[in-house]
Amino acid sequence: MNFTAKDVADLRAKTGCGMMDCKKALTEAEGDVEKATEILREKGLAASVKKASRIAAEGVAYAMVSECGKVGVVIEVNAETDFVAKNAQFIDFVKTCAETVIYENPADVEALLAAKAHGSDMTVDAMLKDKILTIGENIKIRRFVRYEGDCVAYVHGGGRIGVLVRFETENVPAEVLNECGKDVAMQIAALNPAYLDKSTVPAEALDKEKEILMAQIQNDPKESQATSPLSSTLLRKQRRPAAR
């Protein structure tokens, strides 16, 4: 036998196949893990590989802050159906991914997959493949954002929207920051503003909005006499404070 028990375990984590199937495939492949994977696929045994080709269009957004309150993350993980997106095992996996982002600080999704999952000896990728096999649907970690500083997290609609707000503060009590942060986060969840304030709006975006608003006003005879003041008011309404 020119392979080890670890090779069998790695192949099982990669494909979701049983131990005996993995051992047989490695024996046939003379210890080559990639070739063994292909053998399992050809035999129709690599369940997680097959499921990984299916579209993951549903899922959840999850936001959390570290115990010290100085590191926050918002992450999106997708599944195939809304039913699985509400599954306890799926949600636990999403939370584990978020914790791993906080404590391991991966640069991107690829680095997150390679990292050891928080509180586990498995990598995130191995845990992902295990969940695909157990739950029976394709699962994809789509994206995440990690901030360092005074952060407040908010999740709306059971995971339909996740918001993470970072503040620049000095000696603000935690309860005050959390209360204010939740109010701001709820506004962001409701309005989905694109910019923090007027100074952060690109000139081309502002010009485009002016064109749209002017066209709307000109198409409304009632507003034709108050074009300039009204357009300025409408533009101000489009730029509500945000941090997303």
Predicted regions and their residues:
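N-terminal assembly/interaction segments in proteins that build large macromolecular machines
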Residues: N2-R244
